[in-house]
């Protein structure tokens, strides 16, 4: 069994955003400002509630982040869709980290609940992705549940996050 890297720094994550980590045509993260985490603190193909693998990541919050001035003027909060996108980003990263081929695309989620906010006063956002299943067929499909914490309190939950890896068809 191959031992895979179990954590990633910001600089290493950026190599994934540039398409250098998993090879051309394979899973790729967005680059800043759409990259919604600074580091992956732990990633494993086993463990988690379903023993199918998990990812843990962190995002340092500072008052000068790009979304605060425009969402909303005078009442700054991080858009909820960015936290959800981070969960999809991490789900796709996991599939690439497993060595699965193809370009990642968010497909759907079951249920999403927002019970709190990220404001300029927040210091740290943490993400957890707990895999339920990885299906390998015409495409690779990852299905996971996710959560997001702001300064230690769970404020977002998402069930059945789905990300697919798609390979380009040969002409």
Curated annotation (Swiss-Prot):
Pathway info: Lipid metabolism; fatty acid biosynthesis
EC number: 4.2.1.59, 5.3.3.14
Gene Ontology cellular component list: cytoplasm
Compartment(s) of residence: Cytoplasm
UniProt keyword rRNA processing, yes or no: no
InterPro entries: FabA, FabA_FabZ, HotDog_dom_sf
Keywords assigned: Cytoplasm, Fatty acid biosynthesis, Fatty acid metabolism, Isomerase, Lipid biosynthesis, Lipid metabolism, Lyase
Catalytic site: 71
Keyword check for Acetylation: no
GO annotation terms (biological process): unsaturated fatty acid biosynthetic process
Cross-referenced Pfam families: FabA
Any one Gene Ontology molecular-function term assigned to this protein's record: trans-2-decenoyl-acyl-carrier-protein isomerase activity
Catalytic activity annotation: a (3R)-hydroxyacyl-[ACP] = a (2E)-enoyl-[ACP] + H2O; (3R)-hydroxydecanoyl-[ACP] = (2E)-decenoyl-[ACP] + H2O; (2E)-decenoyl-[ACP] = (3Z)-decenoyl-[ACP]
Family the UniProt entry places it in: Belongs to the thioester dehydratase family. FabA subfamily.
Summary of subunit composition and partner proteins: Homodimer.
Function: Necessary for the introduction of cis unsaturation into fatty acids. Catalyzes the dehydration of (3R)-3-hydroxydecanoyl-ACP to E-(2)-decenoyl-ACP and then its isomerization to Z-(3)-decenoyl-ACP. Can catalyze the dehydratase reaction for beta-hydroxyacyl-ACPs with saturated chain lengths up to 16:0, being most active on intermediate chain length.
Name this polypeptide is given: 3-hydroxydecanoyl-[acyl-carrier-protein] dehydratase
Organism from which the protein derives: Sinorhizobium fredii (strain NBRC 101917 / NGR234)
């Amino acid at each position: 069994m191959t031992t895979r890297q179990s954590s990633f720094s910001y600089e290493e994550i950026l190599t994934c955003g540039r398409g250098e980590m998993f090879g051309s045509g394979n899973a790729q993260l967005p680059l800043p400002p759409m990259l919604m985490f600074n580091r992956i603190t732990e990633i494993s193909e086993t463990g988690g509630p379903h023993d199918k693998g998990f990812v843990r990541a962190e995002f340092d919050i500072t008052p000068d982040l790009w979304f605060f001035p425009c969402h909303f003027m005078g009442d700054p909060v991080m858009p909820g869709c960015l936290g959800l996108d981070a969960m999809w980003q991490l789900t796709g990263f996991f599939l690439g980290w497993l060595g699965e081929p193809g370009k990642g695309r968010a497909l759907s989620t079951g249920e999403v609940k927002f019970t709190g906010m990220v404001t300029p006063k927040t210091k740290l956002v943490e993400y957890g992705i707990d895999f339920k299943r990885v299906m390998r067929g015409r495409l690779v499909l990852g299905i996971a549940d996710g959560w997001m914490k702001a300064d230690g309190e769970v404020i977002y939950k998402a069930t059945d996050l789905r990300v697919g890896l798609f390979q380009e068809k040969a002409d």
